[in-house]
């Protein structure tokens, strides 16, 4: 008998969390190289994107009509209070007390409410993603099933991961950090480089020389290459057998990425900036603009992730989820999606973020021997102790 995916929502509430005593997303990576900081934000020299000085995130709690509770989290580290406002003041009123056939019907309903006004991305879709994750978590708990088993009939029981970022101040410290992870069974790592390809190649060569046991390297330039430097980077990183070259050009540059994919060198990976199927579909059609698709579950939710993955698969493009900044709820949701993702790529893993909730989060996900096993727990595999969230709650 197929699982019951219908739902009726009793209540929805979102909470803004901040971890002010923790290290930033960048930790000590390239510290002292001209970074600019404000009270909440940080700009790293060489990149355009703003980052949070300390981890902030919006959690969403959904209670179904039968009392089952689920938790969700959006990947919205900059301005999580915006997601909270959208959830608490707008979306909650639209769905509380309503019945839906399944989470897809809920997602479509909420998307339709504002699509005619152009709200097809950004914080509005982040809020939808957080609610979607929470709803699937609640349904999984009600049905006594991991979410992955609700998404696909035979999820992977185990998968291996790569470390996202080697965030230490000096090259030698970065080498030592990678080698310490290799000793745990890790097979791959992704490094963040600027659009300066000469400097990037020097960094990569130094790491490869200092950590020769690592099997796979990935490179992410965070959208900072020109067309010329991206073409050179694709070639040079390809010569070094980089598994993929991530986010080379500006995220709106469809034509540029299409041209780049056709050039020789490392495969091109991207997708974290897309919220919905409607944004990504053109990018995987011929001439395609990417070789590896990387949706971010904190922006797509489970429901649209599965649709996006299928669209990419029909175009012959494998999917491996992106994992950005967030805590155990977002990470657990991402790992559930990894269990049903394309097996040919290692799964991204943020090694230092999953424990930020400390005792407030009881997770069944445990890194061991270079990867994770799908926990024998219902929902996303995480239980939240609300009473212990109090020290992290930001009240505006």
Where are these regions (language model features)?
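Glycine-rich, aromatic-flanked loop segments that form ligand/cofactor-binding clefts
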Residues: 123-128, 132-168
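Shared catalytic-loop signature of beta/alpha-barrel
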Residues: 241, 252-371
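Hydrophobic faces of well-ordered beta-strands that scaffold small-molecule active sites
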Residues: 70-72, 161-164, 189-191, 215-221, ...
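Metal-dependent enolase-superfamily TIM-barrel catalytic cores that perform enediolate-based chemistry
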Residues: 149-264
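Metal- or metallocofactor-binding catalytic centers and their adjacent structured scaffolds
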Residues: 47, 63-142
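Conserved, mostly hydrophobic/aromatic
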Residues: 67, 91, 131, 144, ...
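Flexible C-terminal active-site loop/helix
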Residues: 2-24, 33-42, 308-311, 325-396
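Non-catalytic terminal accessory/regulatory regions of metabolic enzymes
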Residues: 1-69, 88, 188
């Amino acid at each position: 008998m197929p699982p019951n995916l219908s739902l009726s929502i009793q209540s929805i509430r979102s909470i803004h969390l901040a971890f002010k005593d923790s290290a930033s997303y960048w930790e000590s990576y390239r510290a002292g190289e001209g970074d600019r900081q404000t009270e909440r934000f940080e700009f790293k020299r060489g990149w355009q994107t703003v980052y949070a000085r300390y981890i902030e995130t919006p959690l969403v709690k959904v209670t179904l009509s039968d009392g089952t509770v689920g938790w969700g989290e959006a990947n919205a580290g900059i301005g999580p209070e915006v997601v909270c406002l959208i959830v608490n003041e707008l979306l909650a009123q639209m769905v509380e007390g309503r019945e839906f056939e399944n989470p897809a019907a809920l997602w479509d309903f909420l998307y339709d409410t504002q699509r005619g006004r152009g709200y097809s991305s950004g914080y509005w879709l982040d809020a939808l993603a957080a609610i979607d994750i929470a709803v699937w978590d609640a349904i999984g708990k009600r049905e006594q099933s991991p979410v992955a088993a609700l998404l696909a009939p035979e999820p992977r029981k185990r998968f291996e991961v790569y470390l996202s970022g080697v965030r230490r101040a000096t090259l030698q410290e970065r080498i030592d950090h990678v080698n310490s992870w290799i000793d745990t069974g890790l097979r791959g790592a992704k490094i963040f480089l600027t659009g300066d390809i000469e400097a990037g190649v020097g960094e990569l060569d130094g790491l490869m020389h200092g950590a020769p046991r690592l099997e796979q390297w990935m490179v992410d330039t965070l959208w900072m290459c020109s067309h010329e430097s991206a073409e050179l980077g694709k070639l040079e990183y390809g010569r070094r057998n980089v598994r993929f070259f991530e986010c080379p050009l500006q995220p709106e540059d469809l034509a540029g990425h299409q041209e780049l994919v056709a050039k020789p060198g490392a495969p091109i990976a991207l997708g974290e900036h897309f919220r919905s199927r409607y944004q990504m579909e053109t990018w995987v059609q011929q001439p395609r603009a990417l070789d590896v698709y990387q949706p971010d579950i904190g922006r797509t939710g489970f429901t649209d992730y599965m649709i996006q993955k299928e669209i990419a698969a029909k175009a012959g493009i494998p999917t491996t989820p992106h994992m950005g900044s967030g805590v155990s709820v977002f990470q657990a949701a991402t790992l559930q999606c990894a269990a049903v993702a394309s097996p040919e790529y290692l799964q991204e893993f943020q090694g230092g973020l999953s424990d930020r909730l400390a005792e407030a989060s009881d997770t069944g996900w445990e890194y061991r021997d270079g990867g994770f096993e799908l926990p024998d727990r219902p929902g996303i595999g995480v239980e939240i102790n609300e009473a212990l969230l109090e020290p992290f709650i930001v009240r505006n």
